[in-house]
Amino acid sequence: NNNYGIEIDIRERNDEIIISHDIPINDNFISLDKLLLIYNDIGKKLPLLFNVKCDGIKDKTLSLLRKYSIENYFLFDMSIPETVQYAKDNLVKFLSRVSDIEESPILLDKAKGLWVDSFYGDYPSFSFLEKYVEQNYFLCFVSPELHGRQKKTFWIKLREWLKSKDLKRNTVLICTDKADEAYLHFNHDLED
């Protein structure tokens, strides 16, 4: 009953696209087909971010997205050879990556935005992203608690940077396990 998007890990099993971070060892998973049916039944068109966990599922995934008329989505984290295939298809909305170990996003000219991550600590500033903001790229930040680190300082710095850039809310997302806290933190005093 919230207005949050969903980050979903997808992979293939027995010729079907399923929701699973790891390769499943049993049949305890939900299919992407069923999840999209539920998503459509809810009636909200909230963002869906698909973390692609295996190669070769682009066409099946796009077919399911078309079946349910899903347009507010992004695919990301494909292998580099797979990203090349996604970039060749102008119908695909994919995110390139930038992180503390991936300084130059690949195929950015074909991407709709950036998945912004940091594996070894928080960024000292977000100034390196300004060129992407100026080019109107969508940004999705990975919150530090997903890597086992504290989120408070990162969230404070990110909020200050976002306010200084006057970014539209629909151009920036944060991937977090603390969605309610994030909503309050990033929207407090911003609604005035």
PLM region spans:
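An active-site metal/cofactor-coordinating segment within enzyme catalytic domains
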Residues: 1-55, 63, 71, 75
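Short, well-ordered coil/turn segments that N-cap beta-strands
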Residues: 2-4, 43-48, 69-72, 90-92, ...
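Short charge-dense sequence patches
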Residues: 4-13, 77-84, 104-109
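Long, contiguous hydrophobic alpha-helical segments, chiefly transmembrane helices and signal peptides
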Residues: 5-10, 19, 48-52, 76-79, ...
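Active-site-adjacent beta->alpha loops and helix N-cap segments on the catalytic face
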Residues: 14-15, 19, 28-32, 56-60, ...
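Alpha-helical structural signal in soluble globular domains
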Residues: 38-42, 64-68, 86, 90, ...
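Hydrophobic, well-structured mid-protein blocks that either form specific transmembrane helices
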Residues: 52-104
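C-terminal active-site rim and adjoining tail of enzyme catalytic domains
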Residues: 96-99, 104-192
